[in-house]
């Protein structure tokens, strides 16, 4: 039976220490080799935490597979806008201002892992994350942009 280890790692910066080392040690895998492979596969997500799943396909031969997920929407938005974090009190402070093109770009990246059926729905979902992070879109409240998209005033 295949065993899996799921963890979040910073892109390109996984180490043999916790959480990976202790989780893989009992499975008999070469931890250094696995970490090297994880870092290679996650280097494009430098500075972001990404979900990684290591699945031991064959315990006897120590064959394994590494699956790298897509970072959380909030991490993609922070990287896209070059901000450290969202606003603590979104009604009082604005963490950043994104363009609609940036929001659509994040939606395209995340679409495969979302429940959204099309780009419009995915964009609305990313705008929802903007609401909670205190990020305006083209200088407007993201709720207003969502309303405009739903009303057909803005087409995606």
UniProtKB/Swiss-Prot annotation:
GO molecular function per UniProt: large ribosomal subunit rRNA binding; structural constituent of ribosome
Gene Ontology annotations of biological process type: translation
Classification via InterPro entries: Ribosomal_uL11, Ribosomal_uL11_C, Ribosomal_uL11_C_sf, Ribosomal_uL11_N, Ribosomal_uL11_N_sf
rRNA-binding as UniProt keyword: yes
Cellular component terms per the entry's GO annotation: large ribosomal subunit
Keyword terms of this UniProt record: Ribonucleoprotein, Ribosomal protein, RNA-binding, rRNA-binding
Chain residue ranges for the region called Disordered: 1-20
Assembly with partners or alone: Part of the ribosomal stalk of the 50S ribosomal subunit. Interacts with L10 and the large rRNA to form the base of the stalk. L10 forms an elongated spine to which L12 dimers bind in a sequential fashion forming a multimeric L10(L12)X complex.
Function: Forms part of the ribosomal stalk which helps the ribosome interact with GTP-bound translation factors.
NCBIfam families in the cross-refs: PRK01143.1
Membership in a protein family: Belongs to the universal ribosomal protein uL11 family.
Protein's name in the database: Large ribosomal subunit protein uL11
Organism expressing this protein natively: Thermoplasma acidophilum (strain ATCC 25905 / DSM 1728 / JCM 9062 / NBRC 15155 / AMRC-C165)
């Amino acid at each position: 039976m295949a065993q899996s280890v799921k963890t979040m790692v910073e892109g390109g910066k996984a180490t043999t220490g916790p959480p990976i080392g202790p989780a893989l040690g009992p499975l008999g895998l070469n931890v250094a080799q696995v970490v090297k492979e994880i870092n290679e596969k996650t280097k494009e997500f430098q500075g972001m935490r990404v979900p990684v799943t290591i699945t031991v396909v064959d315990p006897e031969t120590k064959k394994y597979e590494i699956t790298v997920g897509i970072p959380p929407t909030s991490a993609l938005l922070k990287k896209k806008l070059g901000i450290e974090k969202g606003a603590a009190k979104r009604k009082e402070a604005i963490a950043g201002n994104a363009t609609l093109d940036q929001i659509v770009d994040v939606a395209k990246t995340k679409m495969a892992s979302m429940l959204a059926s099309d780009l419009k729905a995915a964009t609305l979902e990313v705008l929802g994350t903007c609401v909670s992070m205190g990020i305006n879109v083209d200088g407007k409240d993201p709720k207003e942009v969502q309303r405009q998209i739903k009303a057909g005033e803005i087409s995606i």
